[in-house]
């Protein structure tokens, strides 16, 4: 099935009865980055584990991604609990397009969020990569400590510490 890649009416799949009962799980979140090695170092320092690396190209990659001449380095990382994965892409061809980092209130991909045992420790690790909070750490109803920071390539990352645990 193909169509206009820039348009998918919100809710149209549900209104048409498509995929209502199909089992689904989140596979990963894909993020295009400027420097895959620096980004891997950032996320592994936060506790994620690299579970695969490859360089992709060829007709299958062009078709799947929708870019002619697609050639990229990729890495898949998983969270320690095994429930979350991110896939990082560093494009070799076509050239990566630099954009301004997104703001929290912009429509589209917003952020990637991680639960951490100790937010201060996580922020110390992030600082080693030159990544700092946008405004500081907030406490939400004595339940969570939360913060947003800019990761490598301007990725908006949320860290959350559950204050109700131990």
Q: PLM features: residue spans?
A:
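Core segments of cupin and vicinal oxygen chelate
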Residues: 32-83, 128, 147-150
């Amino acid at each position: 099935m193909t169509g206009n890649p820039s348009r998918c009416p919100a809710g149209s799949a549900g209104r048409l009865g498509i995929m209502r009962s199909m089992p689904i799980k989140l596979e990963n979140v894909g993020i295009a980055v400027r420097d895959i090695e620096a980004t891997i170092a950032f996320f592994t320092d936060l506790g994620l584990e690299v579970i695969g690396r490859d360089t992709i190209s060829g007709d299958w990659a062009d078709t799947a991604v929708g870019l002619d001449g697609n050639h990229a380095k990729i890495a898949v990382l998983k969270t320690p609990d095994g429930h979350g994965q991110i896939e990082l892409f560093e494009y070799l061809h076509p050239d990566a397009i630099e954009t301004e980092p997104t703001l929290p209130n912009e429509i589209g991909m917003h952020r990637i969020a991680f639960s951490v045992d100790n937010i201060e420790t996580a922020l110390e690790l992030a600082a080693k990569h030159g990544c700092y909070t946008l405004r500081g750490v907030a406490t939400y109803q004595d339940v969570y400590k939360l913060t947003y920071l800019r990761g490598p390539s301007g990725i908006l990352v949320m860290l959350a510490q559950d204050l109700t645990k131990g």
